[in-house]
Amino acid sequence: MKLLTKKFKTIWWRIKSVVARYYYGNPSKKLKIVGVTGTNGKTTTVTILYKITTALGYKAGLISTVENIIVAEKIPATMTTPDSVSLTKLFAEMVSKGCEYVFMEVSSHALDQGRVNGVNFVGGIFTNLTHDHLDYHKNFENYFLAKKRFFQMLPLSAFALSNADDSYGEKILEGIKARKFFYGFPARNAFSTPASNASRNDAGWADAGGKNNSSNSSGREPDFSEKIETKLLGDFNAYNALAIFSASKLLGFREEKVKEILKNIEPPRGRFEYFTSDSGVLAIVDYAHTPDALENVLRTANGIKKENTKIISVFGCGGDRDPYKRPVMGKIGVINSDIAIFTSDNPRGENPDAIIEQMKINLSQEDLQKVKTISNRREAIKEAVKLAQNGDIILVAGKGHEDYQIIKGVKSHFDDMEELKRALA
């Protein structure tokens, strides 16, 4: 019965997509649309590509988890990728406002539900693939196949740009029609070649076809070799910067100008967003809500941590969502923090304390000595501030740009950055 329901829904989604395209005059064909998919890094990549494009003087649109933008008009986002009718309407409005480029996040849910069927993409970017959304996809293979579907729909003329250092970076582009390109660090992956970088000097990109069988380990001659500087912190942002610069190059943007813009660009709201308090505490808010993302931001925090100081993390796991990542994230938080405060993160219909108990499943008695459990997120943040001293780092993870908390079906205002600033004032 469930299978029949899913098939009926799929047919219905496809019909809606076709009708919407017909009604609005197939607006995506009048735009240069670049989609970004992957578990982490989508928002940063599309937002900065949008900022670069507008800084270069083009009119552009943005469709992201944080917000949708038509030229400069901001429209609240309700989901990562809108339904097919809302999406087509957005494209039509972008066309009417003179947009030439659009940068959009493409979620696995959207791909599974056919929300982007028929969209005229000129390029697609793959960031990475790690544990997430298994409550929806049921297993990792289904999650991967949903992501792969995006690249299978790209036309011959489009580019497909993939993270060669990700274990799925090559596999996700197998058998596709579009032109293949890779980016990454050659010290980690043979497909990469020396080129651009955000925090390191050994980053690069390469055309999948290569140029010749030169003597380097990949058998590929570098397409370019340059250094890129950016304010964005962490290896995960180095990969984002690589994807951004490589995509900009593929779109034909002026490289020197792109590098200049990238050097001074700020991260999107809630993506490793930070400030230093008057008491000398570095406070960071990040959207990290997957095991991989949490580990990345904590490693970055450890990389900038001063001697004899502490990292205090505050995070939880969403209710009515993938329960398998809860013990994994709990362990990651403890390993990479001096003090880990487990708290609520949109518990929705679940008991917050029960979620926290699941986060503790993999912890030893020694691990538990580093853990505090405070289900009230506001009180958890206050406790972190109380424990922090000059030079310490507080990371509040999981919600990022979100300005709400959902508890027992009730959605109320809650903003991690607001709470941190208030507590540290």
Show which residues each predicted segment covers.
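Hydrophobic anchor at the start of a short beta-strand
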Residues: 59-60, 101-102, 178-180, 311, ...
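Residue-level detection of beta-strand-connecting loop/turn positions
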Residues: 57, 71-73, 225, 280, ...
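ATP-dependent carboxylate-amine ligase
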Residues: 2-11, 188-190, 196-198, 202-205, ...
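Phosphate-binding loop of NTP-binding sites
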Residues: 2-164, 168-177, 242-251, 305
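Acidic, Mg2+-coordinating active-site environments of NTP-dependent enzymes
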Residues: 29-31, 97, 123-283, 306-308, ...
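A general structural signal for well-ordered alpha-helical segments in protein cores
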Residues: 16, 33, 46, 169, ...
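Short, conserved phosphate/pyrophosphate- and ester-handling motifs at nucleotide-, phospho-/glycolipid
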Residues: 43, 240, 286-290
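Short, small-residue-rich loop/turn micro-motifs
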Residues: 62-67, 184-185, 398-400
